[in-house]
Amino acid sequence: MNPNQKIITIGSISLGLVVFNVLLHVVSIIVTVLILGRGGNNGICNETVVREYNETVRIEKVTQWHNTSVVEYMPYWNEGTYMNNTEAICDVKGFAPFSKDNGIRIGSRGHVFVIREPFVSCSPTECRTFFLTQGSLLNDKHSNGTVKDRSPFRTLMSVEVGQSPNVYQARFEAVAWSATACHDGKKWMTVGVTGPDSKAVAVVHYGGVPTDVVNSWAGDILRTQESSCTCIQGDCYWVMTDGPANRQAQYRIYKANQGKIVGQTDVSFNGGHIEECSCYPNDGKVECVCRDNWTGTNRPVLVISPDLAYRVGYLCAGLPSDTPRGEDAQFTGSCTSPMGNQGYGVKGFGFRQGTDVWMGRTISRTSRSGFEILRVRNGWTQTSKEQVRKQVVVDNLNWSGYSGSFTLPVELSGKYCLVPCFWVEMIRGKPEEKTIWTSSSSIVMCGVDYEVADWSWHDGAILPFDIDKM
């Protein structure tokens, strides 16, 4: 065979192999298409089938894997539907940890906001932590002087519950140095108070858009709850105060639908003082346990009906729950009048359980340190001192601060009642510690059907930071 014939033979064989390879690929593609086109009912391949029913309760997800079907029920919420929130509060035996953000510990080396007044509120699909930033980060020069409550740099922002208030995950909500927020089932509503002390303005946002305003009517630091507002069947309710912090002020209840104010009423409470109410839905009404910053060491109670009729008084229990306060043994309690004759105070909360009450308070009688929650038999309706349960959340060796209430809606929890939850703020820095800043983190607890052991879920940050040593 001459050289030309050898070249032709080798080329022919190579071309044949190429054609054969192409044919194999074509056959492989055809076989694959035919097998997949049969619907996968032979169970050879993994397959997920999602069936979306015309309900607001669930999506059924069926996963077929190696001839085995696994059915999961996934929470689903029709965003065009209002939450009900007319159910009763669940009766609980204790409170289990829900989340802890550890914001100050993380903030020593992370991009975490300087904050105060954190609170939690829930939609049908998630809970979020809201907080008032100081327009600055921990361990940064702009954190200097952030002990101040009101400034043009303060904003309301939020993250998913449990996340630190960091710059990467935080969502802007409103310009505010006082705020509240809640979800009606369709969208988030926020109320942010900002501006000068004598002419402050509260801007209502719905779905992230400004929809209404409330101007200061008494010209003396208009302010609101610093915790979740309350939505019932599409209408959202919150409480505002305007006037002195240490004597008679003026109080109003507001009602909004889709971010537009549709009603308001003045609360007549001569001799009593209401600030920073912690509110929650219960049996179709809004129940609030507030702060008396004037004289009382017992807490004001405000119960609001959908038509804005209200009942106002004090938490009856024969144990004080404000700080500072006197000895338990010397306190008698009252359902109608302030008791204890101690000025100042701290934001707190309580939950009605039939005629009983769960009431939170600092462990220290004189400072914002430690935190415990007590169940007092008949404490909602009588001046009872009978403690039937007590649970420690932060020990008295560690700082606490504000505390407040919220509930898990049935659409989120899957229960037939509203799960009572609370958060405890743990303030660090000025005025108690040698830093240039003031900030806080929080622990969040939710009611369960079991007793929960005492422990201390305190802040745990080691101070001072580098910025404090410069």
From Swiss-Prot:
What catalytic activity does the UniProt entry give for this protein? Hydrolysis of alpha-(2->3)-, alpha-(2->6)-, alpha-(2->8)- glycosidic linkages of terminal sialic acid residues in oligosaccharides, glycoproteins, glycolipids, colominic acid and synthetic substrates
Region annotation (Head of neuraminidase) maps to: 89-470
- Stretches the record annotates as Involved in apical transport and lipid raft association: 11-32
**So where does Ca(2+) get bound?**
292, 296, 322
Q: How does it sit in the membrane?
A: Single-pass type II membrane protein
Q: Which keywords are on file for this protein?
A: Calcium, Disulfide bond, Glycoprotein, Glycosidase, Host cell membrane, Host membrane, Hydrolase, Membrane, Metal-binding, Signal-anchor, Transmembrane, Transmembrane helix, Virion
Kindly list the places in or outside the cell where this protein is found, as annotated in its UniProt entry: Virion membrane; Host apical cell membrane
Where does this protein chiefly localize? Answer: virion
- What positions constitute the catalytic site? 149, 402
Give the region (Hypervariable stalk region) as residue ranges. Answer: 32-86
Q: List the disulfide bonds.
A: 90-417, 122-127, 182-229, 231-236, 277-290, 279-288, 316-335, 421-446
Chain ranges passing through the membrane:
15-35
Glycosylated positions are 46, 54, 67, 84, 144, 293, 398
EC main class here is: hydrolase
Q: Which GO terms describe its biological process?
A: carbohydrate metabolic process; viral budding from plasma membrane
Q: How does it assemble?
A: Homotetramer.
Report what the protein is called: Neuraminidase
Q: Which organism is it from?
A: Influenza A virus (strain A/Duck/Chabarovsk/1610/1972 H3N8)
